[in-house]
Amino acid sequence: MAAVRGSPPEYKVRAVEEIKRMISSKPVVAIVSFRNVPAGQMQKIRREFRGKAEIKVVKNTLLERALDALGGDYLKLKDYLGDQIAIITADENPFRLFRMIEDTKVPSPLKPNQVSPVDVVVNEGPTPIPPGPLMAELQMAGLPVAIEKGKVVVKATTTVVKAGEVVRPEVARALERLDIKPIKIGLDVKAMLDSGVILTPETLAIDTEKVLEDFQRAYQMALNLAVNSAYVTEETAEILIMKAVMDARNLAINAGIFEKGVMEDILMKAHAEMLSLASLLPDEALDEELKSMLSGIAEAAAQATPSVEEREEEEKPEEEEEEEEKEEEAIEGLGALFG
């Protein structure tokens, strides 16, 4: 006789219903891996997410049943099941939620026989390890070490393990001695579903500072283009009015248009041009008033610029002081020599 499968246990039915409620109640759903995350860190993450997002550790089989029951775009998340997973649901922007999840990661040491996800480089320089038997542990890890000025130093920058390699126990122990924590442990986003669109870590991991700089640069370029093409907007109206006033003022002054707002500037410009022309004429062509004005300008210029003699006089006392100091040092040296 063929075996007849009975109804699933009640606790599994309730678990699937709870997962369905979580997923369908929020616009953003994330599947994350929590492999190697300590229980204490997981509790801290729950506390930090409280009021911002809901997190729940789930079994792959139960999550798959919930997704099948919901159907539609939720089925896209089935491609990211596997491993030790949890679901996070939130009203938050997916990029901001991704940043929140990434911020849960903390530096962690590599464990013996673990596959390293990164290249681990120990830089040249002093270490916190005192001379003694611990030096041998560093040498067993392949580090060129020596004692200099009472300290153990690494003589050359060394890659002790490459990405994809198994971490030897000697290397793990040496890195722990050096307090090197090359990896970060925390929740790893596998995928997010936002309004029917799947977002992967490659899409979500954006450099917010660079994006902000790009927006600022684009805004400045757009503002410059709008101002130079006289395109009136809320942002450019004030700048364009100020520019128009300046251009009109300059035109009126240079064209000699007698308007109340520029009369004083026109007279000042004409006066300056008159004095410039007068300075090119011989004295006999000038009246006493012009001669007086030109001489006043010359005297003011002379007072503003110190003469060569004055500069030399200012430098002499400094040179004399330096010579006196040298003589005093020489006398002191002779005194020390002859007791």
UniProtKB/Swiss-Prot annotation:
Keywords: Ribonucleoprotein, Ribosomal protein, RNA-binding, rRNA-binding. Transmembrane segments: none annotated. Pfam families: Ribosomal_L10, RL10P_insert. GO terms for molecular function: large ribosomal subunit rRNA binding; structural constituent of ribosome. Residues 300-339 are annotated as: Disordered. GO terms for cellular component: cytosolic large ribosomal subunit. SUPFAM superfamilies: Ribosomal protein L10-like. One of its GO terms (biological process) is ribosomal large subunit assembly. The keyword rRNA-binding applies. Residues 310-331 have a biased composition (Acidic residues). Forms part of the ribosomal stalk, playing a central role in the interaction of the ribosome with GTP-bound translation factors. Part of the 50S ribosomal subunit. Forms part of the ribosomal stalk which helps the ribosome interact with GTP-bound translation factors. Forms a heptameric L10(L12)2(L12)2(L12)2 complex, where L10 forms an elongated spine to which the L12 dimers bind in a sequential fashion. Belongs to the universal ribosomal protein uL10 family. NCBIfam families: PRK04019.1-5. This is Large ribosomal subunit protein uL10.
